[in-house]
Amino acid sequence: MSVSTLPLAPETTTVSGPGAYAAATTASPAPAAAPGTPVQFLLGTHQPHWLTTAEVPLFVSDRRLRSYRTLPRARSPWALDSGAFTTLSLGHLFDPPKVYLARVRRYRDTIGHLLWAAPQDWMCEPFILAKTGLTLGEHQRRTVANYLQLREHAPDVPIVPVVQGWTSTDYLRCADLYLAAGIDLTAAPLVGVGSVCRRQATTAVHAILDCLHRAGITRLHGFGVKTLGLRRHGHLLTSADSMAWSAAARRQPPLPGCTGHINCANCPRYAYQWRQRVLGDIHARPASVQSALFDLPPAPVT
């Protein structure tokens, strides 16, 4: 099955053995994030129309926005998910980079307040690799190739690079692929970390984030961070997005006063209360273990 419209990156770009970033990890431990660091927590939502009223930063998928003839106008900053995980999970093809970029430009210019957009990256979870029939290294090469294409076609569009892998060494090798292409991730304003959202209860995720920090790649975005991940790894992230509230709401009855739906899986009132509760819980923790990631004002409950 062919799962890409992208040209393959040359095999010669594969980094074997310790590369530049791997060597950097032997220098010194990663510094802890300082309290008060200005960071962002993006509330994930399936409902793009929330952009018109939300007073908190949102994370919205291109797969949800692309069908809108009339786009909403954003009240607050937001970031765009490319929907790459769902695309690969379903065995679908990515749109050509220029087609994706045309949509991103439309969102930026019409919706406004766009912080950044994710690339069409290739996740490296074992079940995704089984679906595509490709190697982890090939997914990494395609991730880097897509970012380079997007940047070449639209240097004015804020696409963030994403590192993919499964082990700490994998992520450093992916970073070295970027470096071989002239992209120094230590200087990037933000770097996404992919293929971590389903294993945040493991020590592997902490090891990956710590390893990237020690390599000098410190401004990290965690995709799909769950509540436990927020508590354990928040101090190693500059930003994160989460839709954990929706899964929790699906397993519970609706909030008192919510009479229009059988659960609150798509309810902004529930989402804002969840966000406020999670932030309050993290802020209530001792200062020595409190995550600077969520040093944000509480969201209004509507």
Question: Where do the protein language model's features map onto the residues?
Answer:
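Eukaryote-skewed repeat-based solenoidal scaffolds used as protein-protein interaction platforms
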Residues: R105-A240
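Low-complexity, flexible helical/coil segments
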Residues: P72-R73, L90-K98, L114-P119, R151-P155, ...
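Alpha/beta catalytic cores of nucleotide-metabolism and tRNA/nucleoside-modifying enzymes
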Residues: S2-T52, E152, A180, A207-L220, ...
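Short, low-complexity, polar/charged sequence segments that are solvent-exposed and flexible
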Residues: V60-S61, W78, P97-L101, L136-E138, ...
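Short, acidic/turn-prone active-site loops that include or flank metal/cofactor-
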Residues: R64-L65, G83-T86, S195-R198, M243-R251
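Generic structural signal of hydrophobic/aromatic residues within well-ordered alpha-helices
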Residues: Y100, V104, Y171-A175, W274, ...
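Non-catalytic, usually N-terminal nucleic-acid engagement modules in DNA/RNA processing proteins
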Residues: S2-A145, A299-T302
